């Protein structure tokens, strides 16, 4: 099948780019006279008008019923994103602000909370972020803290910044030497292991311990197993819904809000966003959920080094500043990875 994008000459592409940029900026249908005045296209309004007719016939722009101007269609935005725009890098001040804001986070929950707030602020869209899956997290450190003769606190820290604390009661009297011995055995066996694989190492740990210390170790391992349950698996957090009111949504606003409230919809949405290591854009009807077909989604994977842990992104109107939004999503994803790697 012939791709009609190949029949568009440079001038028509320039006209389409100008229409998208003006419509995103003004939220008003764009006419040929305005294009001639605002952009150095090098041709008359009449020539621009002819190009707009061709673009409309090919489905890249459309005419609202109440206006003589034209607006981009989903197809027009897709061509703009694929061929006519470049990702806009953030300014030094913006990058510095991101780094400062995120570096103050103390644990994974706060990283997620701060990231969503930051991304919503930077893009003026709705920000969404998926928690890292435990299947992609490993043990970074285990700590045992005596709280009394028969109480211990277990602290589990993962490479993705997750911190779990559990208090273990009702133990036989625990000496400092026993705690130190068990702490060392657990860390030797578990550090660097995937959380889902950690319980398989428990028999090895028990075998290293004297018989009289094993009941305490078994109690600790039982609580540790509970800590490994997928507390956040598949959870998606979103923020910035107040931005929707300023986006020009009207009849579709309730549908968008209802879709955002369904965690399973957001999980599926991010899962459909293609290669997790790449910046991905889904526009309008490309989104399978009916409630989100008036929106565009820009998403990127985040992680540690080459390992992608989950995705984050924004949801907004198809009338979106794509270069700026793509730049913000990409930058924030990179900074989140750096913060996680540094923990």
From Swiss-Prot:
Database matches in Pfam families: HrcA, HrcA_DNA-bdg
A molecular function GO annotation: DNA binding
Keyword Zinc-finger part of the UniProt annotation: no
SUPFAM superfamilies according to UniProt: GAF domain-like, Winged helix' DNA-binding domain
Signal peptide feature range: none
Alphabetical UniProt keywords: Repressor, Stress response, Transcription, Transcription regulation
Keyword Repressor: yes
InterPro entries, A to Z: GAF-like_dom_sf, HrcA, HrcA_C, WH-like_DNA-bd_sf, WH_DNA-bd_sf, WHTH_HrcA_DNA-bd, WHTH_transcript_rep_HrcA_IDD
GO biological process: one example: negative regulation of DNA-templated transcription
HAMAP family, per the entry: HrcA
Role played: Negative regulator of class I heat shock genes (grpE-dnaK-dnaJ and groELS operons). Prevents heat-shock induction of these operons.
Family statement drawn from the similarity comment of this UniProt entry: Belongs to the HrcA family.
Protein name: Heat-inducible transcription repressor HrcA
Organism, scientific name: Thermobifida fusca (strain YX)
Upper taxonomic lineage: Bacteria, Bacillati, Actinomycetota, Actinomycetes, Streptosporangiales
Name of encoding gene: hrcA
């Amino acid at each position: 099948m012939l791709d009609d994008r190949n029949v568009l000459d440079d001038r028509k592409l320039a006209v389409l780019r100008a229409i998208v940029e003006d419509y995103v900026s003004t939220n008003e249908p764009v006419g040929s006279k305005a294009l001639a005045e605002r952009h150095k296209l090098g041709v008359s309004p009449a020539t621009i008008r002819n190009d707009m007719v061709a673009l409309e016939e090919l489905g890249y722009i459309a005419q609202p019923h109440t206006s003589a101007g034209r607006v981009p269609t989903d197809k027009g935005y897709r061509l703009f994103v694929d061929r006519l725009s470049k990702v806009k890098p953030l300014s030094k001040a913006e990058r510095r602000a991101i780094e400062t804001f995120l570096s103050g986070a103390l644990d994974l929950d706060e990283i997620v909370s701060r990231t969503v707030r930051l991304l919503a602020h930077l893009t003026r869209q709705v920000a969404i972020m998926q928690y890292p899956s435990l299947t992609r997290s490993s043990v970074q450190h285990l700590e045992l803290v005596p709280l009394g003769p028969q109480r211990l606190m277990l602290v589990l820290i993962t490479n993705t910044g997750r911190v779990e604390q559990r208090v273990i009661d009702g133990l036989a009297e625990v000496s400092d030497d026993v705690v130190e011995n068990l702490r060392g055995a657990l860390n030797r066996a578990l550090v660097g292991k995937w959380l889902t694989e950690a319980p398989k190492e428990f028999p090895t740990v028990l075998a290293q311990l004297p018989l009289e210390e094993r009941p305490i170790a078994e109690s600790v391992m039982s609580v540790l197993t509970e800590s490994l349950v997928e507390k956040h698996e598949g959870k998606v957090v979103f923020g910035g819904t107040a931005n929707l009111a300023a986006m020009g949504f009207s009849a579709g606003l309730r549908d968008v809000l209802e879709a955002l409230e369904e965690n399973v919809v957001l999980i599926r949405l991010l899962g459909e966003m293609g290669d997790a290591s790449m910046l991905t854009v889904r526009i309008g009807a490309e989104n399978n959920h009916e409630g989100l077909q008036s929106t565009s989604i820009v998403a990127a994977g985040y992680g540690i080094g080459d390992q992608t842990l989950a995705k984050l992104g924004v949801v907004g109107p198809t009338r979106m500043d794509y270069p700026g939004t793509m730049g913000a999503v990409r930058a924030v994803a990179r900074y989140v990875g750096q913060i996680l790697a540094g923990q």
